[in-house]
Amino acid sequence: MEVLTPHTLDEALRAKADHPGAWPIQGGTDVMVALNFDRGRPDVLLNLNEVAELRGFTRENGSLRLGSGLTYADIEHGELKDVLPALAEASRTVGSPQIRNRGTIGGNLGTSSPAGDALPPLLIEGAVVECASLRGRRRIPLVDFVTGVKRNVLEPDELIASIHLTPSNEPQTFMKIGPRNAMVIAVVSLAVSAGDELRASFGSASPRPVLVTAPRDEADSFAERVAAAAAPIDDVRGTERYRRHALEVLTTRALKRVLA
């Protein structure tokens, strides 16, 4: 297995065009698990750790551009924790400090797992994913980016360059249920915001991201609406019935927090 280490985004895109089957790797928190458990073995690994354009975040006319290499630790401890509080809460629940220091939001989106912790808080903020290739760039709403369990719209020659959103500055929160308090894959997760409109998105309860909205004056029925929008399954972490019930309970608790 060959490892390529580009130093600019242009070099990375050229490498991806030349090796469309290459696996991008930055934090490696998902890729290394896949390799260690023989879930795949590409001919080429594309190491993106030296590509400065993918790191950090910038402000653009009131909007934010989050580099795909932005880590959970960056979000948890940096300036973004006050700007995107639900995403910061989600970041604090991811794995261990070592995982949060390495794991990236671009990796979370690229893996496209229904349990991805970054997806619900990004979705309630209307995030848009910027995909790049030598052919150009395109922006896809996050709600349309993930198409199923570990499937997305990325073309073989594309990389996730960044995520764009305009902070709502609305009360928001993130909650997660698992078999223990830390270092756990979510049985159910939930992000909720409350402005003139209530917005909710959940994880581990549908094959792809779902955004549920309602007028603020329909708060009393919102938890039931969120649970009805889910499409959970039975698996080793929880049953369909439990997940749907837990989602309704979490939504009720989240609403009390954001509407207080």
Which residues fall in each region the model found?
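C-terminal structural segment of proteins
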Residues: 1-260
